[in-house]
């Protein structure tokens, strides 16, 4: 039996910047948060530079690239301006996401099938630059297969619908969404894609999904920043890391 790969924790620091921007100025500093998360055990940092700059700013991305010791995952819409910025910063990875100005957060997965003609050149440019590309998509077979055809090295499965169904106490819907995630992760791995997951994850759902052996990275932000208000960011990262390790141990023990 092949060895189960370790599970990485990427901490999304967007909402440190949300708090900062509520009053303007430089406090709290998202780069300081990133450094604290890494010190506590984060394997990487995720930040989303939105077109409207509602939280993370250009200078934040530049400082993150310069100051953190772990990989930077640059979330972005695949627009010409964002592609230019990302190529200039040269993060370890980019995650291409859909984006609408009126949304509170990223509401759905990228339509890779419908946007394949526009996405292909951006993916190729990042591949040529040595920047690892992931596509934030639903666990839909057509989207997964197109991601592989476009030569994206990785996908990030959108876990929001599953997490929302659990929060809303809709067990039938949660079970259906979970089946899609399980099948999607297996299909993606079979297609040669590295599999990540994220959106809406908390301690309970992170522990559950950590048991899927195909998934090698979880990107978690909003829940952790909320928990950090009560116990501190370092303690939250340590608790999430321990939670993920418990879930992963179930794979190893199986």
Swiss-Prot record:
Marked site positions, Transition state stabilizer: 156
GO CC aspect terms: cytosol
Protein name, entry field: Pyridoxine 5'-phosphate synthase
Pathway membership, UniProt: Cofactor biosynthesis; pyridoxine 5'-phosphate biosynthesis; pyridoxine 5'-phosphate from D-erythrose 4-phosphate: step 5/5
Gene3D superfamilies (UniProt xref): Aldolase class I
Species assigned in the record: Rhodopseudomonas palustris (strain BisB5)
Residues annotated to bind 1-deoxy-D-xylulose 5-phosphate: 14-15, 50, 55, 105
Subunit record text: Homooctamer; tetramer of dimers.
CDD domains: PNPsynthase
NCBIfam families, per database record: pdxJ (TIGR00559), PRK05265.1-2 (NF003624), PRK05265.1-3 (NF003625), PRK05265.1-5 (NF003627)
Binding site for 3-amino-2-oxopropyl phosphate: 12, 23, 200, 221-222
Active site: 48, 75, 199
Enzyme Commission designation: 2.6.99.2
Family membership: Belongs to the PNP synthase family.
Job of this protein: Catalyzes the complicated ring closure reaction between the two acyclic compounds 1-deoxy-D-xylulose-5-phosphate (DXP) and 3-amino-2-oxopropyl phosphate (1-amino-acetone-3-phosphate or AAP) to form pyridoxine 5'-phosphate (PNP) and inorganic phosphate.
Entry's Gene Ontology BP terms: pyridoxine biosynthetic process
Pfam hit, one: PdxJ
Keywords (A to Z) from UniProt: Cytoplasm, Pyridoxine biosynthesis, Transferase
Keyword Ligase part of the UniProt annotation: no
Catalytic activity: 3-amino-2-oxopropyl phosphate + 1-deoxy-D-xylulose 5-phosphate = pyridoxine 5'-phosphate + phosphate + 2 H2O + H(+)
